[in-house]
């Protein structure tokens, strides 16, 4: 039986929040999900969470700002996700203390691996297998462009 965790999920895209919430709940974990940073802060004051998944671009504040306020309440390992972030924002996430930074569209295998490593790093014990119950809810990554055909040297 896997260990039970409480996860705070803050994602303003309704469909992605729903899919991620289903994936996390399929692990047997309790999920607190919201689209709003201010609501996430209220939830964190009322409930103790073990780790969080935060979107970078949220209404009212960034995921970085939210993370700083969350850890001022209590230490909380977090994964930051963004589809628009650049290298500077990824570096800022690392400097702020996020466990890792994931680019959207999310690769479910990478998300699973990141969560497994976060759990192992912060809570000890062996890597736990995560169920793939809802893997179909995340859109597939776009195909990589083919290499251009090589031309023979003339």
Model-identified regions with their sequence ranges:
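Short amphipathic alpha-helix used as the core "switch/output" element in two-component signaling
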Residues: 64-76
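Two-component/phosphorelay signaling modules centered on CheY-like receiver
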Residues: 14-32
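Conserved acidic carboxylate
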Residues: 11
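Acidic, metal-coordinating helix/loop segments flanking the phosphotransfer/catalytic sites
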Residues: 33-51
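Acidic catalytic/metal-coordinating carboxylates
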Residues: 36, 62-65
């Amino acid at each position: 039986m896997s260990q039970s965790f409480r996860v705070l999920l803050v994602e303003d895209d309704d469909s992605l929040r729903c899919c991620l919430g289903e994936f996390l709940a399929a692990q047997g974990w309790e999920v607190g999900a919201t689209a709003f940073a201010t609501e996430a802060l209220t939830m964190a004051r009322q409930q103790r969470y073990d780790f969080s998944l935060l979107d970078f671009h949220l209404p009212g504040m960034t995921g970085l700002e939210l993370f700083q306020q969350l850890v001022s309440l209590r230490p909380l390992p977090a994964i930051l996700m963004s589809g628009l972030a650049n290298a500077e924002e990824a570096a800022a996430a690392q400097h702020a203390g996020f466990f890792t930074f994931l680019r959207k569209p999310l690769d479910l295998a990478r998300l699973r691996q990141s969560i497994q490593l976060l759990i192992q790093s912060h809570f000890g014990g062996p890597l736990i297998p995560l169920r793939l119950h809802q893997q179909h809810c995340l859109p597939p990554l776009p195909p990589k462009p083919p290499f251009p055909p090589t031309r023979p040297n003339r």
